[in-house]
Amino acid sequence: SPIRAVCVYCGSADGVDPEYLAAAHEMGGLLAAQGLQLVYGAGKTGLMGAVAEGALRAGGKVTGFVPENLNLPALVHEGLGALEVLPDIQMRKARMSAEADAFIALPGGYGTLDELFETLTWAQIGLHQKPVGLLNTRGYYDPLLHMIERALRDGFIYAGHQVVLVSDPQPVGLLHKLLNIQFPDGIERWGNRD
């Protein structure tokens, strides 16, 4: 597979349903088992902490990216293989995007949705051709998928090949879909890393 590193976007909020945390932990473990590097936002709380723990416990390579203002002991995972501190949140997003060959959004809030939509937007305007997966735990992303269908139907989103978005309720199903995507116009185009 041309995918070597996967960027995971997800929530950092504590106190969410344990099913979300368990799915995030499983996702991290699966990435590690496949020999894939986890690229993520360096957090130790919520789903961020769970996905990192899952990967680390399975012996995976985990790289965290954090903006200076969030580089605090209460927030940042201390056990990461590598930690990169960036000047601001925009640089963090750009670095995470550059490091990754594919993206997965787990459930999350405004930050996760911002990262997800920026990634989809960049694909649509041709800045990258990397696949994006939604882990649809507990149907979390059902309303979002319906919204995207509506936008396609009403002509606000063009149904081209630029955006490759897959979803699955289970981590193993999602990773299988991501790793087996066939790009219509040749897979070599999106794997380029300048």
Where do the model's predicted regions map?
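Active-site/ligand-binding-proximal alpha/beta "capping" segment
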Residues: M91-G126, G133, P184-N192
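Flexible, glycine/proline-enriched loop segments at strand-loop-helix junctions
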Residues: L106-P107, P131-L135, Q162-L165
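Glycine-rich phosphate/nucleotide-binding loop
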Residues: A123, L127-K130, R138-P143
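A cross-family phosphate/adenosyl-ligand binding-site feature
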Residues: S1-E99, T137-V172, H176-K177, I181-D194
